[in-house]
Amino acid sequence: MDRTLIQEILEVVEQAAIASAELTGLGQKDEADAAAVEAMRKRMGSIQMQGRIVIGEGERDEAPMLYIGEEVGSGSGPGVDFAVDPCEGTNLCANNQRGSMAVLAASDRGGLFNAPDFYMKKLAAPPAAKGKVDIRKSATENINILSSCLGMAVSELTIVVMDRARHKDLIAEIRSTGARVQPISDGDVQAAIACGFAGTGTHCLMGIGAAPEGVISAAAMRALGGHFQGQLVYDPAIAMTKEWADYTKEGNIARLNEMGITDGDKIYEADELASGENVVFAGSGITDGLLFNGVKFEKDCTRTSSLVISTLDSTARFTNTVHIKDGAKSISLS
């Protein structure tokens, strides 16, 4: 990968965000997702690369575009693997709530963990706590470590947790330490990455979310130098989700084995989930969020706010782009 490719990857998420944002607040989450998928795939198709989707919209028989294993790009150039979520937080987009974004991770061929469509226990924390907090430890232990690493009182810490029934005990434990809990309804990728930046008011992400999004978060946190660990969850009694109502622990273990994952309890570090020499994260806001604004439609232009983090040059670039419409007569500075 090179810097030219990184610029094109930025444009991929920008176009997906704009497409979804056209439907913000209309209650049409599936349509918003489909629009983002189509826009993302179209822009990817114009890039000089041998791209491959390793995490996408599902298996080939489940998704018409951006399915796992789909080849994208011109068919010549560098080999690049992608983990994509064209509209992360579809409910957030449909309801015009904060935190929806178009997002992807990219790496050299073979550089991203092909996460199954399972759940994942996650722990994200700032660079100062890297290697000190640990997903094996209790929430209380990690909060105390985080307090020490950041030089902050426990009462000043904010821990983000997905608002799910499975997290009832976790939330109670966090609050018992004196730390604050920020429950979120959807979209834990942005919350995880926000832990890597000071000043966001978010100091740690704990709890269980989707495994594919865990890979995208890991790519960003690896490039930032932050802490990220993930552990697959295969027990329906722990996941506590209606999607697994008919699944069994034994059946899920068998599914993992079929995918070549023989140790379902393995704890993955960020550099195992995103192991490539060159790793890039790109996200563009659909709605306003912790890291950037959502898409803004104006008479003569459309504005996007995005973030690209890359190990290639050790940068995190916040980008505000003005997409000028044909016949534009007046473009304001902001």
UniProtKB/Swiss-Prot annotation:
Positions of Mn(2+) 1 binding: D33, E57
Gene3D superfamilies tied to this protein: 3.40.190.90, Fructose-1,6-Bisphosphatase, subunit A, domain 1
Sites where the protein binds Mn(2+) 2: D85, E88, E213
Pathway in which this enzyme or protein is active: Carbohydrate biosynthesis; Calvin cycle
Catalyzed reaction equations: beta-D-fructose 1,6-bisphosphate + H2O = beta-D-fructose 6-phosphate + phosphate; D-sedoheptulose 1,7-bisphosphate + H2O = D-sedoheptulose 7-phosphate + phosphate
Cofactor(s) the record lists: Mn(2+)
Pfam families in alphabetical order: FBPase_glpX
Function: Catalyzes the hydrolysis of fructose 1,6-bisphosphate (Fru 1,6-P2) and sedoheptulose 1,7-bisphosphate (Sed 1,7-P2) to fructose 6-phosphate and sedoheptulose 7-phosphate, respectively.
Assembly description: Homotetramer.
Listed name of the protein: D-fructose 1,6-bisphosphatase class 2/sedoheptulose 1,7-bisphosphatase
